[in-house]
Amino acid sequence: MKNYRAELTGVFGDPVDDNPTGVVEESAFAAKNLNYRYLTIKVLPEDLGKAMDSVKIFGMKGINLTMPHKIKVLPYLDELSPAAEIIGAVNTVIQKEGKLFGENTDGKGFVTALKNSGETLDKKNVTILGAGGAARAIAVECALNGAAHINIINRSIEKGEELASLIQMKTDSSAKYLNWKNNMEIPSDTDILINATSIGFSPNVTDKPDIDYTSITPEMCVCDVIFNPAETIFLKTAAENGAKTITGLGMLVQQAALNFTLWTGVEAPVDVMEDALKKEFE
């Protein structure tokens, strides 16, 4: 007998109209011939509790959470992964046997994309621009994957110091906060430089982080979390200095692939998902 009831996944956020994750996940469901759907749902902050109840009521396999729900969702979850507990934010929820499990795949997606490019984090010095949600997840996962030291460059002293302190206290990596000054020089011993801010994201494609680009060397690997455009001015300028560069597309695809497997138990068709994402931004 044909089954007309699809398994449901989706994303809760506000705004969510420009979120491309559904296209990526739906391409994977189709490629694996799974009767799953991904719903892009606007959820206002005051309605988050009801929305989380609906995950259980509708028997959803899981959901993604985007701004402004990644931290506020925590009280509605039954359990957190070790990384999500350290980060203090969740972007993925998995429902199993009526319980909601929180995971953070932001940093994991970044680390997977980095390793796929041939890089390793073991004993490396990492410098991160920003101290927001993406920076936090990436910093924790870099530390958990063997980074020796992490520099946090941020304009807000409070946020920057808090993240550096978190890394020092909860992981085996050392960490330091550096106040983001104009034309900020990148520490010369940096192996991996990451822009974890939204500077340069469409439509502000001519913007780039205010750093001294002459301090980027060919020995560095330079990464951006921004996926639209893929080749940001930040990455183009770093490449002109001889640095290896990694776009934000890989992080987004790997993050979506992790979500897919967490929800379905099936290995993700990463190539299909990457093609679907690239088509969205052609």
Which role does the model predict for each range below?
Residues K2-S117:
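Phosphate/diphosphate ligand-binding glycine-rich loop within oxidoreductases
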Residues G13, N104, E119, K123-L144, ...:
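Glycine-rich adenosine-cofactor-binding loop
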Residues L39, I150-N151, I246:
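Conserved beta-strand positions in the Rossmann-like core of class I SAM-dependent methyltransferases
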Residues K96, E119-N125, I216-P218:
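Short helix-loop-beta connector
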Residues N145-K170:
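NAD(P)-binding Rossmann-fold cofactor-contacting core
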Residues D172-T245:
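Rossmann-like adenosine-cofactor binding region
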Residues C221, V225-E282:
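Adenosine-phosphate binding glycine-rich loop
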